[in-house]
């Protein structure tokens, strides 16, 4: 029997994947030796994200000569949600507003967002102390659900002071789930902060992202299973932390600025930079983050992406919808004199 010192123990490896707007990057990292075992880059197939992920994983395992059983974790950061908001490419969703008057509905970015997303307003809502102001009236909901059933892929619900008392949001959610199997987002699940218009925007954007992130997660899980990888799947949030794929499946809005967060956290760690800027020029967007005292600076009022102010905790990033994959053309009618479009290869 060999001595303990001569027994070669399998080393745990971590797979990192970034599904960007242009390329999907992946690598195998060994925490024990602090080395990158292998890395690959493949074009992102927007119609079938799973094919890009599958190709990247295959190259990683074969070229890196790593067994699937030695993989301890699969971590994913993605610019998918960020790019979808910048490009206005989220899936259609409907908003149900409870107890919100005209003054509230006309604030912030909500009116613009509702131009292309149907909504219905119900009587109800609570006071700032959580007391019911008006009984919930769901009578307009059934006809509304029938009207939008074929035109949307999800629903968002926001209620007046639902962070103080979520009962009306919960009741409406149950009714929607009884009528349809589409995903439902409650604003009170995304933030405990006041500001109903901002919560409404965050919830509606989340509902628009659910189908996109679902397709991504299904692609990753399908590929890992095909290669025999049983390691947990973790997703990076916009604040640089990792959460489970189940968490992200219902709260994809938490992944906005996930890609830039990964760049900022990585740059801070690798450069030992105390104060500075991190500029990440991708294929679709260019992102600028700030490092102060060795750490990425957080956005105090919530992440802002594509002109939308959200209640998502994230690093402070300035995102422009221009990258190496962008095509710039003269446009006399535009305010800037130019127009941007994307060329996906």
Could you tell me what each predicted segment is?
Residues 2-343:
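N-terminally biased helix-coil "hinge/interface" segments that flank
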